[in-house]
Amino acid sequence: MNIDLQRFCANENDPREYLRAPWRDGGWVYATNGHLVVRIRDDGAESIPARSSRHPNAAAMFRKHIEDRSCEFMVMPPITEPDKCTHCGGAGFVSAIKCEDCVDGEFTHGDYEYTCKNCCGSAAGPGWADAYEKYPSAQRVPCAHCDFMGYSLNRNGATNIGGALYSTVYLWALSLLPQCRICPGDAAYSCLGTGARETPAALIFDGGQALLMPRIE
């Protein structure tokens, strides 16, 4: 099964550009957006760059939370598809143009700075104005209301598994991986000496592994 890791990467609005695409390291290919990290076996694709000094040491995270941890995996509970983002319709992207009235959602008049009303609340976020796809200068921009996922993270809330809360949107995305199984964070309480809120959920699936940080309400 071909697994698209790009959906687990940071989006184009994230200042950490080195997280916007997968990278390879030690026989694995990694992807992360800072909330979750997924890795699959490296099939030798030349288009994927090697880990740089800016990339996190994801291998150490998997070693700590899967290889050195007494995990008891269970089949991922059924996760109902979350409500799609009302701004992008579930696409994760919207059509927008650079706002001509401001810089990143603000403009200066005299000695004061003001919030731009032209792009305030736009689907693409501050500094972008909504536009039709066929508008001459329209660009395909990550939706600012769902962090490129196509589903609102806040509106869909969290799901309790094993005593810890996890983003329903991220759980659902991970549940689509083949034969996905999960070990909730609280299963590692005794061996790591930390609570469920501090320990990521460990997941395994056919061809790879993942870690998901709990959500604090």
Question: Predicted regions span which residues?
Answer:
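Intrinsically disordered, low-complexity linker/loop segments enriched in Gly/Pro
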Residues: M1-R39
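C-terminal functional regions that serve as terminal interaction/effector modules
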Residues: G26-G27, A31-E217
